Amino acid sequence: MPDDAALMKVEVAGVCGTDVSQYRLPLRGGPLVMGHENVGYLSRVGATFAAHKGVKEGDLVFLEHYLPCGHCEWDHMGEYRHCAATEWFYDPKAIRYGYTSTDIAPGLWGGFSHYLYLPLNAVLHRVPKGLTAEEAGVATPMSNGIQWALIDGGVGYASTVLIQGPGQQGLCCLMASKHAGADRVIVTGTSKDARRLEVAKAFGADVVIDVETEDALARIMESTDGRGVDVVLDCTVGAGTAPTLLGIEATKRRGGTMVVQGEGNQEFPSFPIGRLTRKGMTLKSARGHSYRAVELALHQLASHRFPLELMMTHTFGLAGVDYAIKSVGGQGAPGAIHLSVLPWK
């Protein structure tokens, strides 16, 4: 192993909706090992790597899936998600944990395995004391929640927030919003999300709405005294255009921000731009997270303010990866929200 690299023993690899989408698509760029939400212990650390990163063997770390170039403008801002060197969506040769082919040496690029290779440009965070590896495995969706709700959406003290979709991303947006002092948080879902909506209540949601059995807009306006919401966080990938339209209508008369999760592929040929501009709304696309968001996420998780165990529903060994991915996609274990692969289980 090079002196400027390290080896990480994977303790936890989270499973998310992106894994479901990736699993269904044809391979790009050769065979690969999936798993991009990784926590583990540094089992071997080169001297140069240790000096540069300030870590040592035995440290428990959360590993971001980005492997940036280290010298572009985005990297200098801690916005590794925008670095071209790790932009797998447009360049199959870009290196990113969970997406890069095993054909690229040394091949240890996916967390659904026992070990990961960490070159000098790996981005890692020490896990705070008192936080278990499995709890730290929630850091990716929590980072997204903090990025989308607080940093991108501007949620803060006394905000009124609408979160559409009570999956792991939506629930983390909820926790981030409540932690930041939001006054009222409304969470919407469908009838199949009944258990997730109950978890949302336990996490502090002030109002939960089943959009299939209730008039969602009427409930939102009733619960906000007709004012509407300040921020809409749309976490409903694959739900079509209805959530976007609801978000526009539910936003207050003037101003307001709507953040739409950026993994959706649905077309919107008749987007009501006039309704958006007449309200002076800001529309943003949410995708990934910044370095700062991860640091804040680990700090929040370590506070143990929320009953995370309600969201951490299932764990599987490596033999159960197929079932775990299908479960996140709604075709496996019932009641699945956040699932983790424990490679040594």
State where each predicted segment sits:
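Residue-level marker of beta-strand positions
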Residues: 37, 59-60, 74, 115, ...
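Glycine-rich phosphate-binding loop and adjacent beta-alpha segment
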Residues: 182, 195-201, 206, 237-303, ...
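C-terminal capping/lid region of NAD(P)-dependent oxidoreductase domains
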Residues: 210, 222, 226, 231, ...
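Mid-domain Rossmann-like dinucleotide-binding core that forms the NAD(H)/NADP(H) cofactor-binding site
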Residues: 114-115, 122-214, 218
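Glycine-rich beta-strand-centered segment in the early N-terminal region that forms part
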Residues: 1-13, 25-76, 80-81, 128-130
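Cysteine-cluster motifs in flexible loop/terminal segments that predominantly coordinate metals
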Residues: 16, 64-124
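Glycine- and charged-residue-rich phosphate/anionic-cofactor binding loop of Rossmann-like
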Residues: 284-287, 299-322
